[in-house]
């Protein structure tokens, strides 16, 4: 697979390039801020950079007719509308977290929200001090899965890649569901899985849930 990376000089960009290359894929498009180096036409473009790069990413996908894997966080509704519009021209998969474990928890919460609808619920999340968006995209994914108004408690400390806990409580019991990211490598592996999955998909807007659904069938 020929792929491109937006933000290839960043921590995630370097890790994505390394992970994909180790699988035998070939990076043919390197993008970072005002720098663009293109060797060939990428079949898939991967963007885990900043939301400010979105317009550039969309233009490159259109120009090269490349499918897209995008894990950037902090998008507005307007940004998501831009991606919906792009999905009419290419296949794209968008998620605020490409960890398999996180996406499994989303599915669990989808099934629990009716059973625990009368329980109190709060989400606690911790990320590294350089993370700009608050609350995290992952916490918002969990909140959406719960389908009710939930308070999110956010902290930005040290170099923690990601730590999330959802608490459910009534007068006699406490249930906690937790996920801790030990290494950013899980995001790169998830992006690789998504890129290989979407390579030959028809135009459309996909999420990680579509990958899980296909694997469970």
Swiss-Prot record:
One of its GO terms (cellular component) is cytosol. The keyword Hydrolase does not apply. One of its GO terms (biological process) is diaminopimelate biosynthetic process. Belongs to the DapB family. Coiled coil: none annotated. This is 4-hydroxy-tetrahydrodipicolinate reductase. Catalyzes the conversion of 4-hydroxy-tetrahydrodipicolinate (HTPA) to tetrahydrodipicolinate. It catalyses: (S)-2,3,4,5-tetrahydrodipicolinate + NAD(+) + H2O = (2S,4S)-4-hydroxy-2,3,4,5-tetrahydrodipicolinate + NADH + H(+); (S)-2,3,4,5-tetrahydrodipicolinate + NADP(+) + H2O = (2S,4S)-4-hydroxy-2,3,4,5-tetrahydrodipicolinate + NADPH + H(+). It is found in: Cytoplasm. Keywords: Amino-acid biosynthesis, Cytoplasm, Diaminopimelate biosynthesis, Lysine biosynthesis, NAD, NADP, Oxidoreductase. PANTHER family: 4-HYDROXY-TETRAHYDRODIPICOLINATE REDUCTASE 1, CHLOROPLASTIC-RELATED (PTHR20836:SF0), DIHYDRODIPICOLINATE REDUCTASE (PTHR20836). Pathway: Amino-acid biosynthesis; L-lysine biosynthesis via DAP pathway; (S)-tetrahydrodipicolinate from L-aspartate: step 4/4. NAD(+) binds at residues 7-12, 71-73, 95-98. (S)-2,3,4,5-tetrahydrodipicolinate binds at residues 128, 137-138. GO terms for molecular function: 4-hydroxy-tetrahydrodipicolinate reductase; NAD binding; NADP binding; oxidoreductase activity, acting on CH or CH2 groups, NAD or NADP as acceptor. InterPro entries: DapB_C, DapB_N, DapB_N_CS, DHDPR_bac, NAD(P)-bd_dom_sf. The active site is at 127 (proton donor/acceptor), 131 (proton donor). Its EC number is 1.17.1.8.
